[in-house]
């Protein structure tokens, strides 16, 4: 196991020991399912930002309004985000407000099904509310919900879509 993943698993283990739900989330799960080594590991949790900062001694509060705290482990930085719903988007990039929620509701706000999968490295189980694993197998990039709305919310999503489509259709 690479050192980044090992540190992420330790963070998740500590959150779970404290009674919180915690998973690997997003692109790192997608990459692992593709057999690739992720560049970074994001963590999604039921812990609120103030709980995250009380559990871990080395943190940076960079996006607390959005439920994101950076946890430093073994000189590596990990985004640890509270499960959330996003409100309306004000600038084509960031939601005006967020409310903390459940894993299923958190998945519904994400961009593409292949990025909407959680993985619990402690139990070795995938949590997939949007059939993202099937889309990875079929090499399909599909928006979660209404694609037009997803692209309007965040103006970088069409770029992400193009990048992901290029990856999915390349010849091996």
Regions found by a protein language model. Give the residues of each.
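Catalytic cores of the polymerase beta-like nucleotidyltransferase superfamily
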Residues: 1-170
């Amino acid at each position: 196991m690479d050192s980044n993943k090992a540190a992420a698993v330790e963070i998740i283990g500590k959150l779970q020991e404290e009674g919180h739900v915690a998973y690997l989330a997003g692109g790192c799960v997608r990459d692992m399912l593709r057999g690739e080594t992720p560049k970074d590991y994001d963590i999604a949790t039921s812990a609120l930002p103030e709980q995250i900062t009380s559990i871990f001694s080395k943190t940076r509060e960079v996006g607390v309004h959005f439920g994101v705290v950076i946890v430093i482990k073994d000189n590596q930085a990990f985004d640890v985000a509270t499960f959330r719903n996003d409100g309306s988007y004000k600038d084509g990039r960031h939601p005006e407000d967020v409310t903390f929620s459940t894993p299923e509701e958190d998945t519904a706000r994400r961009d593409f099904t292949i990025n909407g999968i959680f993985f619990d490295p402690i139990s070795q189980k995938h949590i997939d509310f949007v059939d993202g694993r099937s889309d990875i197998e079929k090499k399909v990039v599909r928006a979660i919900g209404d694609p037009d709305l997803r692209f309007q919310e965040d103006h970088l999503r069409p770029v992400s879509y193009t990048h992901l489509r290029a990856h999915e259709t390349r010849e091996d």
